[in-house]
Amino acid sequence: MHASLRTNLPRDLMAFFDFPFDSSGGGIDEWPRYPGHAQVLYYLEEFADAFSIRQRIRFNAKVLQAVHDDRWLLTIDGDNGSATEAFDALTVCNGHYTEPRVPDIPGSDHFPASCVHSHNYRSPDGFAGMQVAIVGTASSGADLSQEIAVAAERVYWCGSEKAARLKKTEHLKNVISCGPIRSLIDDGRIELEDRTLIGPVDSLVFATGYHYRFRFLSEHLIQVRDNWVTPLYQDLLCITQPTLALIGLPFKIIPFPIFEIQARWFARMLNGEFGLPTASRMHEAKDSRAEQLRSAGILQRNYHALDNEQYDYYDRLAQECGDSPLPDWYRELGQAARRHVQRWPGCFRDQFLDVHGAPTRYPQS
């Protein structure tokens, strides 16, 4: 996590609904509306303390294997060695920002430039005076292109949607937006898909996402196919063993509220408060969703990207489990925050956003 990292969401939008991101919950009123990573950590620690969560966590315990045989049998490696324990249900919340995803680019074996993934990036200091190429056009690629440009002599920002990215870096004269990479050359140059050559570069930075990994689960339960986790109902529940839920798989979302409704949905299902469709119906829903995405030209590795669909996804889970739908202000603020980024792509975190959500105390200018 790099030192200057800040959220790309206003904190009144990203908070858990029953725990505001200010002094009435887990924050400080004077913090910026787009807080830094240390402030997000503070908020989460306050949340854990407020709801006595720490005492329910077993720290320094690694799950080596999880198998189902009437109950879930977990082999856990802890401070006192390994042991197997039994549980009625299993919720996997191991995240998906740990194992970097680096594309296999022809020529990479003999490419002389240093290569690093954004997962290991900390600051631009090590790029002073360099020619740098950055691969990846999502939030991390945008942030790193702007930050590294302050130190580097030149930054080549490579990937799709070249025209759409120009506004994000137009204020930086040493950032050049380029198309996708075709191959890497042994003299440090890079060949783009249109056969254009750029460089040579001193460093290549991958802001290309992460892999989903569940090494403790058998593949007969969960498979990962080009970063699509299947077979799941509602991007959440294992169809073949519905006492297994995977919380937090979707991306391009407002995380904490989505995690919250997923957890409530699973808890209420386990408690018998609503029934599931038959396994065949859940498979049909999963297959129909995949076909819808495929027909829309969505790559399989992006099937878990919700983006603007996340509001309907939340309400769908809420309706199914008998919870309240999103409050009226939530979608409005989410869409306003999106427009805010489009209006101020290079500096949106420091510009005033005049749409407000839940009562949250933060600087008003």
Feature-to-residue mapping (PLM):
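Glycine-rich active-site loop/strand segments that organize a redox cofactor
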Residues: 1-46, 233-239, 276, 284-309, ...
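A conserved short coil-to-beta-strand element within the FAD-binding core of flavoproteins
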Residues: 56-73, 120-124, 160-163, 169, ...
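Glycine-rich dinucleotide-binding loop and its adjacent helix/turn
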Residues: 21-26, 32, 36-43, 49, ...
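Conserved beta-strand positions in the Rossmann-like core of class I SAM-dependent methyltransferases
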Residues: 156
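FAD-binding beta-loop-beta segment adjacent to the flavin cofactor pocket
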Residues: 1-13, 104-109, 215-245, 253
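Short hydrophobic core segments
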Residues: 63, 74, 84-98, 132-135, ...
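C-terminal, flexible cofactor-proximal segment of oxidoreductases
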Residues: 243-365
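Short beta-strand/turn micro-motifs composed of small residues
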Residues: 136, 159, 248
